[in-house]
């Protein structure tokens, strides 16, 4: 059975390293499903979840919240380089919910004061918090 090696790396180090039969990511151009022997590719990732079906248990799926980044697929090795990434089991949902509330308040304040850059940063923070909540709830 063909397999791929999946590695997710952040500035803090290696977050994820397993063999996979299937990987799904969301790029800026849309969803990308990856099977072994996939064509070599480099793409920019959205803030979204990464789905990994491991080879050791075809019913088990690992979920990782990735905050953007780049994916490289080459010779059955998938490398994701992201600013931050958290496995489903490592996500503190209550902390993510607090971050979501904080981001919503910051969006409202920035909008009222017409602070475009601050509002944009708060929207990205909100998107990241929602992504963490979604992955942590799986």
Swiss-Prot record:
This protein's UniProt keywords: ATP synthesis, Cell membrane, CF(1), Hydrogen ion transport, Ion transport, Membrane, Transport
MF term (GO), any: ATP binding
Transmembrane stretches, start-end: none
GO CC annotations, alphabetized: plasma membrane; proton-transporting ATP synthase complex
Top-level lineage group: Bacteria
Membrane association type: Peripheral membrane protein
Disulfide topology: none
CDD domains: F1-ATPase_delta (cd12152)
Compartment(s) of residence: Cell membrane
Family as reported in the entry's similarity comment: Belongs to the ATPase epsilon chain family.
Subunit structure of this chain's protein: F-type ATPases have 2 components, CF(1) - the catalytic core - and CF(0) - the membrane proton channel. CF(1) has five subunits: alpha(3), beta(3), gamma(1), delta(1), epsilon(1). CF(0) has three main subunits: a, b and c.
Role this protein plays: Produces ATP from ADP in the presence of a proton gradient across the membrane.
Designated name of the protein: ATP synthase epsilon chain
Species whose genome carries this gene: Streptococcus gordonii (strain Challis / ATCC 35105 / BCRC 15272 / CH1 / DL1 / V288)
Gene: atpC
